């Protein structure tokens, strides 16, 4: 069954008398529908010409009216109306690689999907985006999105992510910035790899994209006992956590002076590891990175 095949029609849907389960959504106002982003974007308007394809292959177009931004009331085989895009990286710090065996299969799926970034807040690395997808994000103004940056040095980022394409991320982020796309970013900080001077460089490069780089969280690498055969990583010590806090907060202070916003925030875990008190509420401004363990 095609992913854009309708599985259910809401009783209050403006298409309740025209659409049936098993019909395929072909286009809205002449725009082909390939996934949930197309569907939500083109179904936003109040006046719609909806093309449906019956199971026998015949097509018909239905004209409907609804409130601006109102739902069409259609459900599909999957939420994305497509397969989720899987991760093409081999990150040295991947948390899924460190999970215990014997858990449900869905926990081992590595997604790296711009649609889930926009709709669900998942982080994406940009390494598996085609040129068409980059252009579509800009054209549809899919914003804000969450980007896992980790480093802006091309060679270092390629190493961290285990992907030679990873070095092109800053170039894509500049295109998104020029296209009006807001990005919230994260840096998984690994002692001896992307900390210190490399972290300073990454923050400097990302600050150059403010305000489209709206916020950046610095999160300590998480390590479990299930690391056999994986790259040897070093956990944060209290001293190293304190050094990282000082580096990031000093840079954030400069951003406050320059932009009126801190932009860069350390995860609560670094404060706890360093034995320091968490900052006051006003320090976290909009709490943009709350779900990434910042300001909880």
Feature-to-residue mapping (PLM):
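PDZ-domain C-terminal substructure recognizer with occasional recognition of PDZ-binding tails
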Residues: 40-76
């Amino acid at each position: 069954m095609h992913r854009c095949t309708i599985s259910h029609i809401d009783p209050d849907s403006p298409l309740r008398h025209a659409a049936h389960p098993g019909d395929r959504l072909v286009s809205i106002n002449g725009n082909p529908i390939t996934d949930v982003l197309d569907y939500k974007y083109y179904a936003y308007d109040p006046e719609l010409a909806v093309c449906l394809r019956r199971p026998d292959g015949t097509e018909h177009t239905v004209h409907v009216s609804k409130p601006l931004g109102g739902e069409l009331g259609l459900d599909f085989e999957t939420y994305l109306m497509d397969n989720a895009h899987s991760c093409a990286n081999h990150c040295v710090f991947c948390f899924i690689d460190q999970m215990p065996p014997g858990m449900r299969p869905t926990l081992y799926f590595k997604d790296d999907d711009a649609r889930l970034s926009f709709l669900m807040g998942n982080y994406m690395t940009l390494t598996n985006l085609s040129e068409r997808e980059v252009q579509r994000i800009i054209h549809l103004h899919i914003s804000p999105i969450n980007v896992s940056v980790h480093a802006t040095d091309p060679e270092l980022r390629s190493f961290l992510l285990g992907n030679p394409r990873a070095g092109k991320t800053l170039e894509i982020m500049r295109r998104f910035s020029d296209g009006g796309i807001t990005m919230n970013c994260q840096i998984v900080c690994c002692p001896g790899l992307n900390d210190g001077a490399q972290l300073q460089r990454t923050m400097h490069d990302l600050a150059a994209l403010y305000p489209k780089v709206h916020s950046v969280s610095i999160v300590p690498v998480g390590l479990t006992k299930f690391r056999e055969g994986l790259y040897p990583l070093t956990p944060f010590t209290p001293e190293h956590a304190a050094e990282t806090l000082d580096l990031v907060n000093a840079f954030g202070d400069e951003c406050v002076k320059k932009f009126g916003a801190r932009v860069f925030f350390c995860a609560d875990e670094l404060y706890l590891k360093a034995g320091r008190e968490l900052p006051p509420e006003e320090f976290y401004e909009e709490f943009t990175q709350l779900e990434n363990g910042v300001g909880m």
